[in-house]
Amino acid sequence: MPVYQLIPEIPLFPPIEEAEDDGLLAVGGDLTKERLLGAYRRGIFPWYEVGQPILWWSPDPRLVLFPDELKISRSLRKVLRKEQFEIRFDTAFQEVIKSCADVRTKQGKGTWIIPEMQQAYTELHQEGFAHSVESWLDGKLVGGLYGISMGQCFFGESMFSTMNDSSKVALVALADFSQRVGIKLIDCQMTTPHLLSLGAREIKREVFLKMLKNHLETPSIKGLWNNDPVSMKVNLLQN
């Protein structure tokens, strides 16, 4: 199948069914708020590296995590009970997204979180769509994740850790928060052994798109997410 070339400033996408076997749907376009939010509503996300045009993907199958299916290992439960990390929401979004990029670079891996992407998602954060979940230790950011929240869905983009289990604790906090505010689906996009071990599972793209349509009918939670350290501590210890 041909890969569609998108026209900048016209936020349209071809039918999802036109995607390549690897999930590649289109190239080009831009990273405006309208384009990005329109993409997520359709089950599409950008993923590309320096020197490449913007690449838009919709893989089949799709990796998702239902918040109540998160698997918490015995060792992670011990970490949660120690209350080692302080969890915060939306207090250091730019630092989280930059750390996600920097950690991958230091590990010798390529990163799609290039400066243009960081800027685009920071603007979405300022608009109340993009959020960060952060693990702090002694006043220092040591792990976290970020993504887009729309309707009853959270579209996870990336996570990082500079200490063992710090990103896992952030994911536990996200799953807990999701259940409390009515988020039904966490989109993990691409399949990885790490996410599978935490309870994520693959579903067919057509099933994902039906879920997406249903869950996006609910109004989005816009604005900064509430930070409540007392209730967060209680909920984490209940896992």
Q: What does each model-found stretch correspond to?
A:
Residues 1-239:
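N-acyltransferase acceptor-side catalytic subdomain
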